Amino acid sequence: MNLRTFSTPALFLDCVGPTLLAREGESSLLLGIALRLVDGHSYGDEAPFLACVEDEGRCPVVALRTPPFNLTLCGDAGRLDALSLVADHLAHAGCSLPGVHGRIDLTDSFGSLWQALTGAVPRICQGQRLYQLTEVATSASAVGRPRWAESRDAALLA
């Protein structure tokens, strides 16, 4: 298992794109930022941190940060070994993280590792929810026919 960093957003997406798309519901923020970076958008003066942990052909953790903004994580919260590689790399690089985005179990696990490395005490600043469509229900067609609006419909239109 190793931490792999990327010099360009295109190389990053080539490697982690399939992983992110497979978990699109939870990785939409990370994926959106990466796609904007590929298109040439800049979020600050510093180069972005683009990384994944590789383990036997899989990416259990994907990380992205556009300084000075928060770290964004996607992956398996149970893989403390993989999260530890990300935390160790950032701590040894002297990074000061203002925050971490991701699923609560993932950010909690990372926060504990980060606290052990840096002494920074993590806290939840803003809880958010993400909804994912898992099933589409079809509905019956509406009965009726189209018609032009008339003056008697004014209250419905205005």
Can you annotate each of these PLM segments?
Residues 11, 15, 29-33, 81-85, ...:
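Exposed alpha-helical structural elements
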Residues 13-17, 38-42, 109-113:
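Short, solvent-exposed polar/charged micro-motifs at secondary-structure junctions
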Residues 17-20, 34, 86-87, 111, ...:
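A generic alpha-helix structural signal
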Residues 25-26, 43, 96, 120:
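A general structural signal for well-ordered secondary-structure junctions
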Residues 37-58:
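A short helix-loop-beta-strand connector motif used in the catalytic cores of GNAT acetyltransferases and
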